[in-house]
């Protein structure tokens, strides 16, 4: 049975791997010249299995108003003429209640913890290396209010059996010795089972392993639309040619909604623009041990072999990929405060990418109203974290095997009207430029 996977980021590539392992004939199609050249290219590098939280959280609407006037705000909204932007923001606001936050976080933790197990199993099986570290995540709190607010997160972590530690200043320094000079840290939440790693390196190496296993990758291919007969997808237009298969997987990140919209599906995935800096380490003793998350700025500082990756922030600004000097200054501010002697900022590489976010934070994985069309998208800032679990979960669904975790709330049908039957048949679409 032939499957076309549309997209060669970390989500598309892990999907291809697990589908091939399940016995499918797999072809991956992408318009880039190679794998992991967009959102997966230079993300923060966190494998945040325990630190998994939706942006839609209690208190965020009030904070967002204040952030409008802050230079280094973690969230920025740039209103435009895009109705999808306003629809997505409204849905996000509706998820900023304690009840919805608990439901959404529980779903995300379920997938993230499963993904940790899948990644560990994959590493043991095929020995893939990606500058990974298994030394945990430390979430830094600069105010007592931030520390107190972590109580709800801790409750959900305990519910799912996720190990954690609440650290005082001495505990922070023990976990991350280079932070001994930093003043004003009131505490931290440490998640010892979290990991780090270079997402692009992982994806490139897994893609090669996919090829060795019989997966075909076709790059520099423009995907311009799906064609259906009302019940099934009959093909996808690629470089002006109709490509056919038995099943189709859409793993195009923020560009997924444009592909399925002409089929009558309104997929609530919107790009959250993020930024990163990658700088060479100058003094290993003054660099991070693993991953630090600065709660005030929502910025992560991650250690690779000989590099530091600083990433974070979220801009609701459509498909704009321009680089913002202000955002660079925020990243430089955080790494200079925490690790002033750890790396060389003068040699830093600045990058931006679009994370495909849902308003509730949970990805969209699984079946659609079309019997042979599947989605694997909407992971937001956690695509790297959830990639292996999402790929394995999808392969199990498509193989009619019982997934190892609950399927509750993971597919598009949780949005009600967004899972309705298609209104138009045999239509195509044109994706936004990227």
Swiss-Prot record:
Keywords: FAD, Flavoprotein, Oxidoreductase. It catalyses: a D-alpha-amino acid + A + H2O = a 2-oxocarboxylate + AH2 + NH4(+). It holds the Pfam family DAO. It is an enzyme of class 1 (oxidoreductase). The keyword Chloroplast does not apply. One of its GO terms (biological process) is D-alanine catabolic process. Its cofactor is FAD. InterPro entries: DadA, FAD-dep_OxRdtase, FAD/NAD-bd_sf. The keyword Acetylation does not apply. Its EC number is 1.4.99.-. FAD binds at residues 3-17. GO terms for cellular component: cytoplasm; plasma membrane. SUPFAM superfamilies: FAD-linked reductases, C-terminal domain, FAD/NAD(P)-binding domain. GO terms for molecular function: D-amino-acid dehydrogenase activity. Pathway: Amino-acid degradation; D-alanine degradation; NH(3) and pyruvate from D-alanine: step 1/1. Belongs to the DadA oxidoreductase family. Oxidative deamination of D-amino acids. HAMAP family: DadA (MF_01202). This is D-amino acid dehydrogenase. It comes from Stenotrophomonas maltophilia (strain R551-3).
């Amino acid at each position: 049975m032939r499957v076309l996977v549309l997209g060669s980021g970390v989500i598309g590539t892990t999907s291809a791997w697990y589908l091939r392992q399940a016995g499918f004939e797999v072809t991956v199609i992408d318009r880039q010249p190679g794998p992991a050249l967009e959102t997966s290219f230079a993300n923060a590098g966190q494998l945040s299995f325990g630190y998994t939280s939706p942006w839609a959280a209690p208190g965020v609407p009030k904070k967002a108003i204040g952030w409008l006037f802050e230079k280094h705000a973690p969230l920025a909204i740039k209103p435009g003429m895009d109705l999808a932007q306003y629809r997505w923001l409204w849905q996000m606001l509706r998820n900023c209640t304690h009840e919805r936050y608990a439901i959404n976080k529980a779903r995300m933790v379920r997938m993230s913890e499963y993904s940790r197990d899948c990644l560990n199993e994959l590493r043991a099986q095929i020995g893939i290396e990606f500058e990974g570290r298994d030394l945990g995540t430390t979430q830094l709190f600069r105010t007592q209010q931030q520390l107190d607010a972590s109580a709800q997160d801790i409750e959900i972590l305990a519910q799912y059996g996720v190990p954690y530690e609440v650290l005082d200043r001495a505990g922070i320094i023990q976990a991350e010795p280079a932070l001994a000079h930093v003043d004003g840290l009131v505490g931290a939440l440490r998640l010892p089972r979290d990991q780090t790693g270079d997402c692009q390196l992982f994806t490139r190496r897994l893609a090669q392993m996919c090829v060795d296993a019989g997966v075909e990758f076709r790059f520099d291919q423009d995907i311009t639309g799906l064609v259906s007969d009302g019940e099934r997808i009959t093909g996808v237009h690629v470089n002006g040619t109709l490509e056919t298969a038995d099943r189709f997987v859409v793993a195009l990140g923020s560009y997924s909604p444009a592909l399925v919209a002409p089929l009558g599906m309104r997929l609530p995935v919107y790009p959250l623009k993020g930024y990163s800096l990658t700088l060479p380490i100058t003094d290993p003793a003054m660099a991070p041990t693993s991953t630090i998350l600065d709660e005030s700025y929502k910025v992560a500082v991650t250690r690779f072999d000989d590099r530091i990756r600083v990433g974070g922030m979220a801009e609701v600004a459509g498909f704009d990929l321009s680089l913002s000097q202000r955002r660079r200054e925020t990243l430089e501010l955080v790494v200079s405060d925490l690790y002033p002697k750890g790396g060389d900022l003068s040699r830093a590489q600045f990058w931006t990418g679009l994370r495909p976010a849902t308003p509730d934070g949970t990805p969209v994985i699984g079946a659609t109203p079309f019997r042979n069309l599947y989605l694997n998208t909407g992971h937001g800032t956690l695509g790297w974290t959830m990639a292996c679990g999402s790929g394995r979960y999808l392969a199990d669904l498509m193989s009619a095997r019982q997934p190892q975790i609950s399927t509750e709330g993971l597919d598009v049908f949780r949005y009600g009207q967004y899972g309705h039957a298609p209104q138009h048949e045999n239509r195509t679409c044109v994706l936004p430029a990227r």
